Amino acid sequence: MTDNLTRAFKELLNQERFGSQSEIVDALKKQGFTGINQSKISRMLSKFGAVRTRNTKMEMVYCLPNELSVPNTSSPLKNLVLDVDHNAMLIVIKTTPGAAQLIARLLDSIGKSEGILGTIAGDDTIFVTPTSDKPIDELLQNVQRLFENAL
């Protein structure tokens, strides 16, 4: 296996979020690699410990183990926060697996000065509740600004 093929394979899994081995085969062929077939991709997936997991759109996709590792305080926020959405009552932040509690702790440390009453974090989802005097749109802007500045 060439270094170029290995590098391209890992980049595809890290960036493109492929759901099937045939999609990976097609993508590598489009990049000019020859002799690529499903059985070779299957061996590469096993060799690098790739697993199938759900992305934020609830699609099953291949990921490399380093993407699934527990993030730490040195992980850039841009790599951890996948989506920020809201309704009239709260903000929902989607993160990479394992990152929600780390980010919730950061938000809790900022707390009431930014209009955050509190957070509830699971593995990859955070609920952020505003203080009673903070409009949800203003809190959303504060949270988004925090992630932009920390990127």
From Swiss-Prot:
<dbReference type="GO" id="GO:0003700">
    <property type="term" value="F:DNA-binding transcription factor activity"/>
</dbReference>
<keyword id="KW-0055">Arginine biosynthesis</keyword>
<dbReference type="InterPro" id="IPR020899">
    <property type="entry name" value="Arg_repress_C"/>
</dbReference>
<keyword id="KW-0028">Amino-acid biosynthesis</keyword>
<keyword id="KW-0804">Transcription</keyword>
<protein>
    <recommendedName>
        <fullName>Arginine repressor</fullName>
    </recommendedName>
</protein>
<dbReference type="GO" id="GO:0006526">
    <property type="term" value="P:L-arginine biosynthetic process"/>
</dbReference>
<dbReference type="Pfam" id="PF01316">
    <property type="entry name" value="Arg_repressor"/>
</dbReference>
<dbReference type="GO" id="GO:0005737">
    <property type="term" value="C:cytoplasm"/>
</dbReference>
<dbReference type="InterPro" id="IPR036390">
    <property type="entry name" value="WH_DNA-bd_sf"/>
</dbReference>
<dbReference type="GO" id="GO:0051259">
    <property type="term" value="P:protein complex oligomerization"/>
</dbReference>
<comment type="pathway">
    <text>Amino-acid biosynthesis; L-arginine biosynthesis [regulation].</text>
</comment>
<dbReference type="Pfam" id="PF02863">
    <property type="entry name" value="Arg_repressor_C"/>
</dbReference>
<dbReference type="InterPro" id="IPR001669">
    <property type="entry name" value="Arg_repress"/>
</dbReference>
<comment type="function">
    <text>Regulates arginine biosynthesis genes.</text>
</comment>
<keyword id="KW-0805">Transcription regulation</keyword>
<comment type="similarity">
    <text>Belongs to the ArgR family.</text>
</comment>
<dbReference type="InterPro" id="IPR036388">
    <property type="entry name" value="WH-like_DNA-bd_sf"/>
</dbReference>
<dbReference type="InterPro" id="IPR036251">
    <property type="entry name" value="Arg_repress_C_sf"/>
</dbReference>
<dbReference type="GO" id="GO:1900079">
    <property type="term" value="P:regulation of arginine biosynthetic process"/>
</dbReference>
<keyword id="KW-0678">Repressor</keyword>
<dbReference type="InterPro" id="IPR020900">
    <property type="entry name" value="Arg_repress_DNA-bd"/>
</dbReference>
<dbReference type="GO" id="GO:0003677">
    <property type="term" value="F:DNA binding"/>
</dbReference>
<keyword id="KW-0963">Cytoplasm</keyword>
<dbReference type="GO" id="GO:0034618">
    <property type="term" value="F:arginine binding"/>
</dbReference>
<keyword id="KW-0238">DNA-binding</keyword>
